[in-house]
Design a protein with these regions (language model features):
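N-terminal Rossmann-like NAD(P)+-binding domain of SDR-like oxidoreductases, especially those catalyzing
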Residues: 1-196, 238, 244, 248, ...
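C-terminal substrate-binding subdomain of Rossmann-fold SDR/epimerase-dehydratase oxidoreductases
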Residues: 19-25, 32-40, 60, 71-74, ...
Length: 350
């Protein structure tokens, strides 16, 4: 039986690394794409290799193979070369400027990477006349829903509240257009927030857990946060990459919401993280004056700062994965407590 070939853009990110894990276990020939930078970060892939070798760990990854390439969604020639040379069966586009707040500081870059980059990939597939030979997956975002009332599903109205969300909505619509106009197998996975030990420190969940651990160990005095009452549907990246793969195994392309059907606030995330870390806190004050006090020493360890609020807040995101459960037989395995526990364990490993 012929082994499938997958090409992954954004291979060194949180989702890319977990997707590589999954595909290698499924005996894929995997090609990952990373941007060339002054200090490229491939640490999320270190576990794939034997300590004293560049070869994959054979006992864990069977016959799967991984080759990394340099490329960039802003460089059309590199995209064209990769697709022509590799001839992939599946393309997963997980690459993005993914930080919502930063997107307003670099709007043109965000739009080019998140939006125009997707257009370039689909146009290359079409121009090579590989519409029937390549399956394309686009990582869409729940941020596209903005302040549309939850629960949000495939029929909910989009109402983007950031440059990031606007760029993602452009890409979402481009995928639909190329699918309907040219017959490409192009699917959108509308992913709600998903975290893991491999999440970077500039995302609020990792920021919270890392700071609280440091505070407990007297390595940090305070944690500063923005909107404590922003509610999100948080899942585990491991679950979500499985959904990506399942979407690509369908006979026809589709757009699906991937979520947990539940939500908690940033404040509740803090409370559960404190509970698991053994930090007893008490909240006092309101608004920008709200604070958390460590009951063991009466010191203020959490404060609210206006600079961490978004330009336009998205108050409540909660997905409905009913369609995904029906179409691809998917549901999340991790609950929020298990997710937080895994993230804390990941810090301990570090």
């Amino acid at each position: 039986m012929r082994r499938k070939k997958a090409l992954i853009f954004g291979a060194t990110g949180q989702d890319g690394s977990y997707l590589i894990d999954l595909l290698l276990k499924k005996n894929y020939i995997v090609h990952g794409v990373k941007r060339r930078g002054s200090s490229p970060n491939t640490s999320r892939l270190d576990h794939l290799y034997s300590k004293d070798s560049s070869r994959l760990r054979p006992n864990f990854y069977s016959k799967g193979s991984l080759t990394m390439h340099y490329g960039d969604l802003l460089d059309n020639s590199s995209l064209h070369r990769l697709i022509v040379d590799i001839k992939p069966d599946e393309i997963y586009n997980l690459a993005a400027q993914s930080h919502v707040k930063i997107s307003s500081e670099i709007p043109e870059y965000t739009a080019n990477v998140n939006g125009i980059g997707v257009l370039k990939l689909l146009e290359i597939i079409k121009s090579l006349k590989r519409e029937k030979k390549i399956k394309f997956y686009q990582a869409s975002s729940s941020e596209m829903f903005g302040n549309t009332l939850p629960p949000q599903n495939e029929n909910s109205e989009f109402n983007p509240q950031s440059i990031y969300a606007i760029s993602k909505l452009f890409a979402y619509n481009v995928v639909k257009y190329y699918r309907e106009a040219y017959g490409l197998f192009a699917s959108n996975g509308i992913l709600f927030n998903h975290e893991s030990p491999r999440r970077t420190y500039n995302f609020v969940t990792k920021k919270i857990i890392n700071a609280l651990k440091n505070i407990k160990e007297d390595k940090q005095k305070k944690l500063f946060l923005g909107n404590l009452y922003s509610k999100r549907d948080w899942g585990h990246a491991k679950d979500y990459v499985e959904a990506m793969w399942k979407i690509m195994q369908l006979k026809s392309p589709i757009d699906l919401v991937i979520s947990t059907n539940s939500q908690i606030s940033v404040k509740q995330f803090v409370n559960e993280s404190c509970r698991q870390l053994g930090i007893r806190i008490k909240w006092v004050g309101k608004g920008l004056n709200e604070k958390a006090i460590n009951l063991d020493n009466n010191k203020i360890i959490i404060e609210v700062k206006k600079k961490y609020f978004r330009d336009k807040e998205v108050n409540s995101l909660c997905g409905d994965f009913t369609k995904a459960k029906k179409i691809i037989n998917w549901k999340p395995k991790y609950k929020i407590r298990e997710l937080i526990s895994d993230m804390i364990s990941g810090l301990n490993i570090d």
